[in-house]
Design a protein with these regions (language model features):
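N-terminal signal-anchor transmembrane segment
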Residues: 2-71, 89-102
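Loop-to-helix entry and N-terminal half of a specific, functionally important transmembrane alpha helix
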Residues: 25-31, 226-232, 416, 432-467
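Interfacial loop-to-transmembrane-helix boundary motif in multi-pass membrane proteins
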Residues: 26, 82-86, 129-170, 219, ...
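Transmembrane alpha-helices of multi-pass inner-membrane enzymes
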Residues: 27, 254, 453-464, 470-511
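Aromatic-anchored transmembrane helix interface
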Residues: 54-61, 84-91, 104-137
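Alpha-helical transmembrane segments of multi-pass inner-membrane proteins
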Residues: 151-179, 196-265
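Long extracytoplasmic/lumenal interhelical loops at the membrane interface
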Residues: 190, 343-419, 439
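A membrane-periplasm/extracellular boundary helix in multi-pass inner-membrane enzymes
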Residues: 261-357, 382-384
Length: 511
């Protein structure tokens, strides 16, 4: 009797150990992202602060994970070298920020450090997830013929997180407590989240992971779940969010999934999967009906911007301005010699003059902020003519609030310098570029899941260049990291020919 009890206790202890694994904790970090986002929004608005509880909660699991890796694996020197590199860069960057900051700066040293910490954790999380989901358990899973088991946890974690996101969004809409995507004009709805652009990007990138779960290998309950969530997400993104990314992005994701599925069947001379085509068409039709009945906040936003464009007047030319009203006033002061260099440096003043002249010459819309910001920062780099700033950046928060870069890829290069660009952005770009190389070389054995994940990664890079709110958002980065891990795993499957090794009958969704 006692032996049986001791056996049962051992089994229970093993089960508990299996539950509290690093892989499960990392999946939990993905699942709680929507809860952390909502808590951040409520905390910041209630206490009117830039900090929140989630600022301190998010790093806990990654710190535990990196500590585990440091003491359990034989890569201590590499971790120490990487830590020194990122710390050294941060010190140089903050020092430059401190030296060049003027009165017009939108943030102080603490805010700048906050961005550096977020980006460092972003790269650290990428390493952690690759280590646990693409390296550590791989040999064991191959031996046990369970390759991809831990990765399935990541995909299901993304599905659960997406479900929570859309559930919270509709709850905010039903209770009429949703905030507006564009608060100044009360257009679009973003629920209890900080940014409409970021919540839209999170949902779109999640769909790149979730939609391939419609294949026959998953249980019927999972497929129904995915279908319902996709329709709800599509209805929200296309009718209620109010951003072009949401409206056109959803159509791109669904069409990409249909295209990859059809392409596979054509390449492998299989019958077209009519169910997939039917599901895709149904999703697009349902969303189209929703847009027709309820209208689209995106279209409303475009009309509002067009009206706003005609309202901004340039008193120096007596015509509609091609820059913002604030920029017109700043340029007037600069031309009149009334701008204090303690408020705005000489190089910034010249960059504003160049921006004003270029915008008028090219007839740029005064509401096209991203183009105006790109012109300003390009001119500022030329005017500063500084090697240290070129290498370590001229600061993200050191500019007048209108010129804080929304386009993240150029921001990495201009505001964080060439070294910052390599430290924070290049790791993701390498994965994306190598994924393209593998697909072009071995496209006949590429799974639809791989094609979708790689498309999602490139979609994130393109969106971060065009609209922003991608790499600068902690929760969005978790989905990008999940996409990266899927891509790496799929590449390893192809390179090692493991599809046949661990399951020769599997692979009915390859391109």
């Amino acid at each position: 009797m006692q032996k049986e009890l001791s056996k049962k206790n051992k089994i229970k202890n093993k089960n508990h150990c299996r539950i509290f694994t690093m892989e499960n904790l990392l999946c939990l970090l993905i699942i709680i992202c929507p809860i952390l986002d909502v808590s951040s929004f409520i905390f910041r608005n209630f206490f009117n602060t830039n900090f929140s509880i989630s600022t301190f909660v998010r790093p806990i699991i990654p710190i535990v994970a990196i500590t585990y890796i440091f003491f359990k694996d034989k890569i201590k020197p590499q971790i120490i070298i990487a830590g020194i590199a990122y710390l050294g860069y941060a010190i140089c960057h903050v020092y430059i920020f401190y030296k060049i900051k003027t009165g017009c700066a939108y943030g102080n040293e603490l805010r700048e450090i906050q961005y550096l910490v977020n980006y460092t954790f972003m790269v650290m999380n990428l390493f952690i997830y690759i280590y646990f989901f693409a390296v550590k358990n791989r040999e064991k899973e191959i031996t046990q013929q369970t390759v991809g088991k831990s990765l399935e946890k990541v995909k299901k974690a993304v599905l659960i997180a997406l479900t929570i996101y859309i559930a919270l969004m509709y709850l905010a809409l039903i209770t009429k407590t949703s905030s507006f995507t564009y608060g100044e004009t009360q257009v679009g709805y973003k629920g209890w989240f900080e940014s409409g652009n970021s919540i839209g990007t999170i949902m779109l990138l999640s769909l790149f992971i979730v939609l391939p779960m419609l294949n026959k290998e998953n249980k019927l309950a999972i497929r129904i779940w995915v279908l319902m969530i996709t329709v709800l997400v599509g209805a929200y993104l296309c009718t209620l969010l109010g951003t072009r990314t949401g409206l056109f992005g959803f159509i791109i994701v669904v069409m990409a999934y249909i295209a990859f599925t059809v392409l596979y069947n054509l390449l492998n001379k299989n019958k077209l999967n009519k169910k997939i085509l039917t599901i895709g068409v149904i999703i697009l039709v349902l969303v189209g009906i929703a847009v027709t009945i309820f209208g689209s906040k995106t279209i409303e936003r475009r009309r509002e911007l067009k009206n706003k464009e005609n309202e901004i007047y340039d008193t120096m030319t007596n015509q509609t301005a091609h820059v913002t009203g604030d920029t017109v006033e700043l340029v007037k002061k600069i031309k009149a010699g009334q701008m204090d260099e303690n408020y705005m440096s000489e190089s910034m003043q010249q960059a504003y003059l160049d921006l004003y002249n270029t915008a008028n010459e090219k007839q740029i819309s005064n509401t096209n902020m991203r183009t105006l910001q790109l012109i300003y920062h390009s001119n500022l780099i030329k005017e500063q003519n500084s090697i240290p700033m070129l290498l370590f950046g001229n600061g993200y928060m050191s500019h007048y609030y209108e010129m804080i870069f929304e386009m993240e890829v150029p921001a990495f290069l201009f505001n964080f310098g060439v070294i910052g660009f390599f430290l924070y952005f290049i790791p993701f770009l390498i994965i994306a570029v190598y994924g393209i190389y593998v697909i072009l070389k071995k496209f006949r054995v590429v799974k639809v899941e791989f094609a979708m994940a790689l498309s999602g990664l490139w979609f994130a890079i393109i969106i971060s260049f065009l609209s922003g709110y991608t790499f600068f958002n902690s929760s969005t980065m978790m989905i990008i990291i999940a996409l990266s891990v899927i891509v790496i795993n799929q590449i390893k499957d192809i390179d090692d020919n493991e599809v046949k090794i661990y399951n020769p009958e599997k692979g009915n969704d390859t391109l």
